[in-house]
Amino acid sequence: MNTKITNFTFDKKNLNLAEEIIKKYPPHGKRSAILPLLDLAQRQNGGWLPVPAIEYVANMLAMPYIRAYEVATFYTMFNLKRVGKYHIQVCTTTPCWLRGSDDIMKICEKKLGVKLKETTEDQKFTLSEIECLGACVNAPVVQINDDYYEDLTQDKMGKIIDKLQND
């Protein structure tokens, strides 16, 4: 299966949305729309940003590709490789680690049959580590796509995975 993306353009709906986003910024500051436009491109492309999508957004904002690439590689919310339908991101910073994020990672690996930074064969799950999600009071925390799961135990995490596997 060839997974290389050689071209990207926003579909009509997202192009209209991108234009509306850009209008929120002054003409001399439209480059500031880089984060929402990269996010829009990633959502349109199934959860990851191929190089042509980054190039497209850079051109749309009249900025050098390297500047857009720097943004895409700096923020952990952007994925430069394909991810599964469910992107499970386990917070492993100190508060989550103290409250058992290692155990959460272990149950994820066991239930999914993959290691950190891997995607299941059926492309349904990708397991990642992430830095602080800002929900330390409810550690350990996992983000799956756009949703946070807090105060997790191995049992709770196992049930979440079971539910998603049956989806």
Curated annotation (Swiss-Prot):
Keywords: 2Fe-2S, Iron, Iron-sulfur, Metal-binding, NAD, Quinone, Translocase. Its EC number is 7.1.1.-. One of its GO terms (molecular function) is 2 iron, 2 sulfur cluster binding. Signal peptide: none annotated. InterPro entries: NuoE-like, NuoE_dom, NuoE_N, Thioredoxin-like_sf. It holds the Pfam family 2Fe-2S_thioredx. Binds 1 [2Fe-2S] cluster. It catalyses: a quinone + NADH + 5 H(+)(in) = a quinol + NAD(+) + 4 H(+)(out). Disulfide bonds: none annotated. Its cofactor is [2Fe-2S] cluster. [2Fe-2S] cluster binds at residues 91, 96, 132, 136. Belongs to the complex I 24 kDa subunit family. NDH-1 shuttles electrons from NADH, via FMN and iron-sulfur (Fe-S) centers, to quinones in the respiratory chain. Couples the redox reaction to proton translocation (for every two electrons transferred, four hydrogen ions are translocated across the cytoplasmic membrane), and thus conserves the redox energy in a proton gradient. This is NADH-quinone oxidoreductase subunit E. It comes from Rickettsia conorii (strain ATCC VR-613 / Malish 7). The lineage of its organism: Bacteria, Pseudomonadati, Pseudomonadota, Alphaproteobacteria, Rickettsiales.
